[in-house]
């Protein structure tokens, strides 16, 4: 892993998980929230089943009223507030989905709430928060990431006496998220099947901890696979370190899972179940590719975190006929992001490349580039050039979309043989990051 860590192991980590969550706790929560939210579908996916050789089922949490599983933990927490706590109000921090769940709870209970979200939260999610909360919710946009927004929410709760509903590191929240697993097992049982693997997206770890807790009691032979964004793999960092630590930086693209530090309780639950939990990472480019595939093939609008389970699926091999459940955790994606999503996917698949090309300042050079260097099915998607009459050459920024990823080597060979000087911009360089 390339992240730099700041060691912050909490001395109370193990103590916080001393009273681990049992299946009975989750079943009680399921009964508590079942009058408000209906079970989400568990759908067989022919395309992914054919690609993997396994039986792939999608748990459609993107079809919740708030388009995310987060309503489960928020509702389980809010339903247990005393009248005194309701009168004092609710505070929450979220990258967007938990906020919508809390907003839904505030409106349904008639409780005032203040919700803190980081500045990179998509406008679509901000708007949906207000739709669900209406006049019962005020939105506070602050901080460059979830952790900074969370710090502001904690300060608010301490100052005002409002109840803070945690997005992932609280017992009632984790128990609520665990009802996803209870539904999965019930739905599979009704089909006469049992799960061999459950693929779980991971940010702060609340969903993973809830699923692991339920499966440990009710389906101990089921393997749980947690998938984190490669740019925010905080659970893997915690397991490697022996306790939760804070990543110095995270890539905010997978906004629903861009968490610098996993929850202490969630870490404890996962650590105690390492024999049945496997952790892995998915690159942001792989996530984008799966988002597009889900939309184009199944008509599913998944947010980046919602596609993590599918991105992880593609990196694994399964015994033929294995039953694998992928949790599509959310569908709150801003349509304005799809241009960036498509770009990242093309780069990930090796179809999009950028070059700095030094054209001699004389007629016919661009025609030469197009005819002799570019492949017959390749396309120029970006061309920025400013002619300078007082120079022998002029530099152009050129983006090329290849018809096949395998065509890169021959393109580079033609560039090498050409009299026109060119340089490929490598991923990870400042120029490249600026473009993508």
Swiss-Prot record:
<feature type="region of interest" description="Regulatory">
    <location>
        <begin position="358"/>
        <end position="436"/>
    </location>
</feature>
<dbReference type="GO" id="GO:0003941">
    <property type="term" value="F:L-serine ammonia-lyase activity"/>
</dbReference>
<dbReference type="InterPro" id="IPR036052">
    <property type="entry name" value="TrpB-like_PALP_sf"/>
</dbReference>
<feature type="region of interest" description="Catalytic">
    <location>
        <begin position="1"/>
        <end position="357"/>
    </location>
</feature>
<comment type="pathway">
    <text>Amino-acid biosynthesis; L-isoleucine biosynthesis; 2-oxobutanoate from L-threonine: step 1/1.</text>
</comment>
<dbReference type="GO" id="GO:0006566">
    <property type="term" value="P:threonine metabolic process"/>
</dbReference>
<dbReference type="InterPro" id="IPR000634">
    <property type="entry name" value="Ser/Thr_deHydtase_PyrdxlP-BS"/>
</dbReference>
<dbReference type="GO" id="GO:0030170">
    <property type="term" value="F:pyridoxal phosphate binding"/>
</dbReference>
<dbReference type="InterPro" id="IPR011820">
    <property type="entry name" value="IlvA"/>
</dbReference>
<dbReference type="InterPro" id="IPR038110">
    <property type="entry name" value="TD_ACT-like_sf"/>
</dbReference>
<protein>
    <recommendedName>
        <fullName>L-threonine dehydratase biosynthetic IlvA</fullName>
        <ecNumber>4.3.1.19</ecNumber>
    </recommendedName>
</protein>
<dbReference type="GO" id="GO:0006567">
    <property type="term" value="P:threonine catabolic process"/>
</dbReference>
<feature type="binding site">
    <location>
        <begin position="203"/>
        <end position="207"/>
    </location>
    <ligand>
        <name>pyridoxal 5'-phosphate</name>
    </ligand>
</feature>
<dbReference type="Pfam" id="PF00291">
    <property type="entry name" value="PALP"/>
</dbReference>
<feature type="domain" description="ACT-like">
    <location>
        <begin position="353"/>
        <end position="427"/>
    </location>
</feature>
<feature type="modified residue" description="N6-(pyridoxal phosphate)lysine">
    <location>
        <position position="70"/>
    </location>
</feature>
<keyword id="KW-0100">Branched-chain amino acid biosynthesis</keyword>
<feature type="binding site">
    <location>
        <position position="329"/>
    </location>
    <ligand>
        <name>pyridoxal 5'-phosphate</name>
    </ligand>
</feature>
<dbReference type="InterPro" id="IPR001926">
    <property type="entry name" value="TrpB-like_PALP"/>
</dbReference>
<comment type="function">
    <text>Catalyzes the anaerobic formation of alpha-ketobutyrate and ammonia from threonine in a two-step reaction. The first step involved a dehydration of threonine and a production of enamine intermediates (aminocrotonate), which tautomerizes to its imine form (iminobutyrate). Both intermediates are unstable and short-lived. The second step is the nonenzymatic hydrolysis of the enamine/imine intermediates to form 2-ketobutyrate and free ammonia. In the low water environment of the cell, the second step is accelerated by RidA.</text>
</comment>
<comment type="subunit">
    <text>Homotetramer.</text>
</comment>
<dbReference type="Pfam" id="PF00585">
    <property type="entry name" value="Thr_dehydrat_C"/>
</dbReference>
<keyword id="KW-0663">Pyridoxal phosphate</keyword>
<dbReference type="GO" id="GO:0009097">
    <property type="term" value="P:isoleucine biosynthetic process"/>
</dbReference>
<keyword id="KW-0028">Amino-acid biosynthesis</keyword>
<dbReference type="GO" id="GO:0004794">
    <property type="term" value="F:threonine deaminase activity"/>
</dbReference>
<dbReference type="GO" id="GO:0006565">
    <property type="term" value="P:L-serine catabolic process"/>
</dbReference>
<keyword id="KW-0021">Allosteric enzyme</keyword>
<comment type="similarity">
    <text>Belongs to the serine/threonine dehydratase family.</text>
</comment>
<dbReference type="InterPro" id="IPR050147">
    <property type="entry name" value="Ser/Thr_Dehydratase"/>
</dbReference>
<keyword id="KW-0456">Lyase</keyword>
<feature type="binding site">
    <location>
        <position position="97"/>
    </location>
    <ligand>
        <name>pyridoxal 5'-phosphate</name>
    </ligand>
</feature>
<dbReference type="InterPro" id="IPR001721">
    <property type="entry name" value="TD_ACT-like"/>
</dbReference>
<keyword id="KW-0412">Isoleucine biosynthesis</keyword>
């Amino acid at each position: 892993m390339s992240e730099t860590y700041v060691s912050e192991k909490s001395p109370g980590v193990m103590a916080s998980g001393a009273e681990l969550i049992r299946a009975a706790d989750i079943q009680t929560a399921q009964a508590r929230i079942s009058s408000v939210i209906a079970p989400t579908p568990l759908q067989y996916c022919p395309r992914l089943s054919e690609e993997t050789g396994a039986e792939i089922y999608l748990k459609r949490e993107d079809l919740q009223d708030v388009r995310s599983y987060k309503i489960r933990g928020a509702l389980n927490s809010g339903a247990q507030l005393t009248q005194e706590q309701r009168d004092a109000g609710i505070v929450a921090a979220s990258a967007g989905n938990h906020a919508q769940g809390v907003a839904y709870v505030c409106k349904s209970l008639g409780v005032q709430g203040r919700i803190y979200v980081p500045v990179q939260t998509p406008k679509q999610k901000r708007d949906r928060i207000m739709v669900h909360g209406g006049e019962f919710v005020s939105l506070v946009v602050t901080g460059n990431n979830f952790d900074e927004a969370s710090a502001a929410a904690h300060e608010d709760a301490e100052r005002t006496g409002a109840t803070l509903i945690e997005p992932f590191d609280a017992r009632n929240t984790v128990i609520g998220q665990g009802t996803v697993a209870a539904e999965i097992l019930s739905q599979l049982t009704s089909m006469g099947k049992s799960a061999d693997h459950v693929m779980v997206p991971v940010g702060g770890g609340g969903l993973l901890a809830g699923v692991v807790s339920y499966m440990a009691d009710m389906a101990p032979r089921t393997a749980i696979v947690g998938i984190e964004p490669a740019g925010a793999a905080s659970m893997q960092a915690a397991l490697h370190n022996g306790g939760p630590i804070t990543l110095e930086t995270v890539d905010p693209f997978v906004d629903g899972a861009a968490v610098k530090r996993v929850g202490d309780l969630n870490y404890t639950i996962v650590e105690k179940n390492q024999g049945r939990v496997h952790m892995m990472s998915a690159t942001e480019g792989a996530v984008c590719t799966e988002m597009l595939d889900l939309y184009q093939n199944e008509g599913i609008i998944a947010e980046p975190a919602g596609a993590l389970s599918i991105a992880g699926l593609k990196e694994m091999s399964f015994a033929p006929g294995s039953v694998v459940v992928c949790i599509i955790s959310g569908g709150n994606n801003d349509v304005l992001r799809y241009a960036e999503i498509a770009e990242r996917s093309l780069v990930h698949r090796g179809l999009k490349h950028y070059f700095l090309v030094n054209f001699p300042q004389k007629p016919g050079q661009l025609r030469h580039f197009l005819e002799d260097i570019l492949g017959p099915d390749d396309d120029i998607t970006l061309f920025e050039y400013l002619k300078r009459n007082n120079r022998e050459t002029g530099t152009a920024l050129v983006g090329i979309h290849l018809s096949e990823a395998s065509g890169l080597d021959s393109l580079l060979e033609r560039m090498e043989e050409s009299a026109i000087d060119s340089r490929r911009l490598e991923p990870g360089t400042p120029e490249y990051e600026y473009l993508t």
